[in-house]
Amino acid sequence: CPGFVNMVRKHYPELNDAVSTTVSPMCGVSRMIKAKDPGAVTVFIGPCLAKKSEVVDQKIEGNADYAMTYSEIRAMMRAKGVALEPVENTYQEASVFGKRFGNSGGVAAAVQECLKESGNDIDIKVCKANGAAECKKALLLMKLGKLPEDFIEGMACDGGCVGGPSSFKDQKLAKKSRDALIKEADDRGIYKNLSNYDEDSFSMHR
């Protein structure tokens, strides 16, 4: 979550070194595309405003070239008279854990699943900071050395990315719709899914 990372940088700079070096899914996908097609221009479209600040952060090489909100792409399509119609789509690319990334707790669940699949029987405690207020509280506890959990999953928007400021649906309705789609996901594991990609061609770290 770029909003969470920005919060750390601005208000808790002493915790900068504790932030994961893993880049965001937006950046990871952009790097993967550019590894295959160096001349590609990548555009992220979603409900997140903080992605715009991440795009202009020159320290993140290979990131998306542009970030647009749903409001912006909707306005562009309306101006051009484009009307989207629902289509049947049975194609799936991400694992169910990847599909849950947009929900609060989704990233933490993926980390725990990775440990499980890799045979690392580690009992880790996760602080799922849902929304800016919980993020601030968790970071303050960490700063004081009083955070009881092992790591923080920080989501600046309530409910996770689905609660972003450019979301057109009510948060509960958006989560309900996403949960319905997630139920249709197959049962492939994370590592099995990652085997479909040439991970040696790009880096997932800052």
Labelled PLM ranges:
Residues 1-206:
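Iron-sulfur-associated redox domains of electron-transfer enzymes in respiratory
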